Amino acid sequence: MLIILTGLPSVGKSTFSKAFSKKMAEKNIDNIILGTDLIRESFPVWKESYEEFIRDSNNYLIKEALENKFSVIVDDTNYYNSKRRDLMNIAKECDTNYVTIYLKAPLNLLLKRNIERGQKIPNEVIKNMYEKFDTPGTKYAWDLPDITVDTTEKIDYNEILNEILEINENKNLKIEEDKIPKSEPVESDLVKIDSLTRNIVGNLIKTGKIDKKDIKLLSEIRKSFLKDCKKIESEKLDFEKIEKDFLDYLNKNLK
């Protein structure tokens, strides 16, 4: 079974996944927590050039775990419905069920929690992600979450596990082809560019190369760059050039 978590930074995904994993183990359900951040944090330094390897490695580990009959908890933001769709398709490829869990909390609480844990991610980035977040089920019926968890309230892990086991028993595994769409190349490329530029910005802030007072401006510059990228034809996209162009664009507009 593939358990897909989705939710913004500081909503409590890691806390939830660890507690839920332990609860599954108590019921003798072999499981593992996987996610891109777990791989990303294994590097001594971050480089944008690592991102494709990180994504591919995470997908490979998920597939291997599912094929070896482990239940997998995916601890990632999965803030775009396309990311959730790709995970659903992995479950389908591995002939296993998936369950989506949407963890939510108000923006003001997310920002407060982020400050309390040392602002690993700048609050301005979380605000930007909050604005762009594809709330599960608001666009497509296939994206409706199986379970929604309000992390401002006490979480009953036993109840959630029982609900998941029931869903797993009753859910039709052989989903028809048209229920979960395949990735559209243009959309997929734009998601990659969004992720690429977001990681570059996050790294610049984390390493202190950008002054905190410029974070809001940096976010606006990134948005402007992404708008320009939408005009590029998919077959003409060169991600190495886009990375260089984005850094040049930042240098030019931050002066």
Curated annotation (Swiss-Prot):
One of its GO terms (biological process) is conversion of seryl-tRNAsec to selenocys-tRNAsec. SUPFAM superfamilies: P-loop containing nucleoside triphosphate hydrolases (SSF52540). One of its GO terms (molecular function) is ATP binding. ATP binds at residues 7-14. Signal peptide: none annotated. Its EC number is 2.7.1.164. Pathway: Aminoacyl-tRNA biosynthesis; selenocysteinyl-tRNA(Sec) biosynthesis; selenocysteinyl-tRNA(Sec) from L-seryl-tRNA(Sec) (archaeal/eukaryal route): step 1/2. Keywords: ATP-binding, Kinase, Nucleotide-binding, Transferase. Transmembrane segments: none annotated. It catalyses: L-seryl-tRNA(Sec) + ATP = O-phospho-L-seryl-tRNA(Sec) + ADP. Gene3D superfamilies: 1.10.12.40, P-loop containing nucleotide triphosphate hydrolases. InterPro entries: KTI12/PSTK, L-seryl-tRNA_Sec_kinase_arc, P-loop_NTPase. PANTHER family: PTHR12435. NCBIfam families: selen_PSTK. Belongs to the L-seryl-tRNA(Sec) kinase family. Specifically phosphorylates seryl-tRNA(Sec) to O-phosphoseryl-tRNA(Sec), an activated intermediate for selenocysteine biosynthesis. This is L-seryl-tRNA(Sec) kinase. It comes from Methanococcus maripaludis (strain DSM 14266 / JCM 13030 / NBRC 101832 / S2 / LL).
